[in-house]
């Protein structure tokens, strides 16, 4: 394992190690990528947990619809693998594929101010949820927001009118009372 990872401000969390698998030092991974096996396309991972940062190399991986199993270079013991439980798996954003106009990664949307058609600040996007039919934005109140309500807004063409990353804003068609 290498102790010189990429700069922390360039890293995006794409998964999390949550357990061990078997006796050969493999780890179970929850992937935040879609499809989940895309996480295995990144061969060098930066692991972060509570101020601890380390870099590891992926040797092999496999999985199903729920989780992945990964073999990391130099990790051959179950007890050593157990120590990695809880680490977030990060990669530099520069490794992400380019998107077309109008497409965004979730990390780009998190933190955007959400403004309705009347110009009212509803809050900021805290995180997104995958629901099956469409993604859902969890909008939490912030300084200057209309009220102190948490809102769940669908990430759909009907709801999202415009995204301005430079301004840090998203315009939505949404009734503030809903």
Swiss-Prot record:
Q: What is this protein called?
A: Ribosome maturation factor RimM
| Protein's gene | rimM
UniProt keywords (A-Z) are: Chaperone, Cytoplasm, Ribosome biogenesis, rRNA processing
- By its UniProt entry, which PANTHER family does this protein fall under? RIBOSOME MATURATION FACTOR RIMM
Q: Give the PRC barrel domain ranges.
A: 101-178
Where does this one sit in the cell? Cytoplasm
Functional note: An accessory protein needed during the final step in the assembly of 30S ribosomal subunit, possibly for assembly of the head region. Essential for efficient processing of 16S rRNA. May be needed both before and after RbfA during the maturation of 16S rRNA. It has affinity for free ribosomal 30S subunits but not for 70S ribosomes.
Q: Which family does it belong to?
A: Belongs to the RimM family.
Q: Which GO terms describe its cellular component?
A: cytoplasm; ribosome
Organism classification? Bacteria, Pseudomonadati, Pseudomonadota, Gammaproteobacteria, Pseudomonadales
Q: Which GO terms describe its molecular function?
A: ribosome binding
Which NCBIfam families is this protein grouped with? 16S_RimM (TIGR02273)
């Amino acid at each position: 394992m290498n102790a010189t990872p990429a700069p922390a401000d360039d890293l995006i969390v794409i998964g999390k190690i949550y357990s061990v698998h078997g006796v050969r030092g493999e780890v179970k991974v929850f992937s935040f990528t879609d499809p989940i096996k895309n996480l295995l396309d990144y061969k060098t991972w930066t692991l972060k947990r509570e101020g601890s940062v380390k870099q590891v190399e992926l040797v092999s991986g496999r999985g199903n619809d729920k989780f992945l199993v990964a073999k990391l270079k130099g990790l051959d013991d179950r007890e050593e693998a157990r120590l990695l439980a809880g680490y977030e798996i990060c990669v530099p954003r520069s490794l992400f594929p380019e998107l077309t106009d109008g497409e965004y990664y979730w990390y780009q949307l998190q933190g955007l101010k959400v403004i309705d058609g009347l110009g009212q600040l509803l809050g900021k996007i805290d995180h997104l949820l995958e629901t099956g039919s469409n993604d859902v934005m969890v909008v939490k109140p912030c300084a200057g927001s209309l009220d102190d309500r948490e809102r769940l807004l669908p990430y759909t063409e009907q709801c999202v009118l415009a995204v301005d990353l430079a301004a840090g804003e998203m315009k939505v068609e949404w009734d503030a009372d809903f």
